[in-house]
């Protein structure tokens, strides 16, 4: 991190701490993602027709939500997010499908949150990946004759960081948040068409050390007691 960014972060934290102060309220907060950072999360790529193919990627889409319970300045939360990732490769001549990848990432996080402020508040924290999380990829191999399949991923792990700004009035809060999720996984590709194509140098992917980072802008409401 550059010196300018570090100074800006220190200044922002100082302003927030000074403006918000300690909270004595009990809060229940609900947040939902309204936007996902545009990024190519594709895991697989075709190697047979690289020079004569075109690739299109749909913007990743995330749904789900977070629920937090804060007692004064500390609280717990649960977050469930589902991110859809799609990428397709076709020939430039004839528009024939070469490879279509559709990945569904389901993440469940247990969050620890800290909060300050009452009329204007600042909440931040971290989450760890919990049970029920999964990463599945559906592959359509197009013209090459290999059967389509869905690959499962194993050894899923990860964590998350988040921050939320809030404005309080008449027992309710309006909330604006940002969340970053870091996911690691390995592919269970034993006996799969993907492994056959990889051995034949027709398909490229990493079976271990897969890393996916997603970022969401969130909006929400809160109730205070």
Language model: regions and residue ranges:
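Predominantly the C-terminal beta-signal and adjacent terminal strand-loop region
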Residues: 155-161, 166-225
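Structural signature of transmembrane alpha-helix termini at the membrane-water interface
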Residues: 14-17, 122, 225
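Gram-negative (and chloroplast) outer-membrane scaffold detector with strong preference
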Residues: 65-172, 212-214, 223
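Cleavable N-terminal export/targeting peptides
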Residues: 1-27
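Outer-membrane beta-barrel proteins
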Residues: 37-43, 83-91, 133-139, 183-194
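Short beta-strand-initiation
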Residues: 6-8, 62-64, 160
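Flexible coil/linker segments and helix-coil junctions enriched in charged and small residues
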Residues: 45-52, 93-98, 144-145, 194-201
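Short glycine/proline- and aromatic-enriched beta-strand/turn motifs that initiate or cap beta-hairpins
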Residues: 19-92, 222-224
């Amino acid at each position: 991190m550059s010196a300018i960014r570090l100074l800006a972060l220190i200044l922002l934290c100082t302003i927030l701490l000074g403006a918000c102060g300690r909270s004595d309220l009990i809060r229940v907060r609900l947040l939902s993602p309204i936007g996902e950072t545009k990024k190519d999360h594709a895991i697989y790529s075709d190697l047979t027709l690289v020079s004569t193919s075109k690739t299109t990627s749909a913007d990743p889409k995330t749904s789900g939500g977070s629920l937090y319970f804060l007692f004064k300045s500390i609280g717990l939360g649960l977050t469930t997010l589902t991110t859809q990732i799609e990428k397709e490769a076709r020939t430039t001549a004839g528009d024939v499908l070469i490879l279509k990848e559709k990945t569904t990432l389901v993440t469940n996080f247990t969050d620890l949150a800290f909060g300050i402020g009452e009329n204007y508040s600042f909440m931040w924290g971290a989450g760890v990946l919990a049970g029920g999380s999964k990463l599945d990829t559906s592959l359509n191999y197009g013209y090459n004759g290999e059967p389509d399949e869905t690959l499962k991923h194993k050894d899923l792990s990860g964590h998350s960081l988040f921050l939320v700004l809030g404005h309080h009035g008449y027992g309710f809060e309006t909330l604006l948040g940002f969340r970053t999720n870091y996911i690691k996984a390995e592919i269970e590709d034993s006996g799969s068409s993907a492994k056959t194509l990889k051995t034949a140098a027709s398909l490229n992917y990493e079976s271990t050390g897969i890393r996916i980072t997603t970022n969401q802008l969130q909006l929400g409401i809160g109730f205070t007691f």
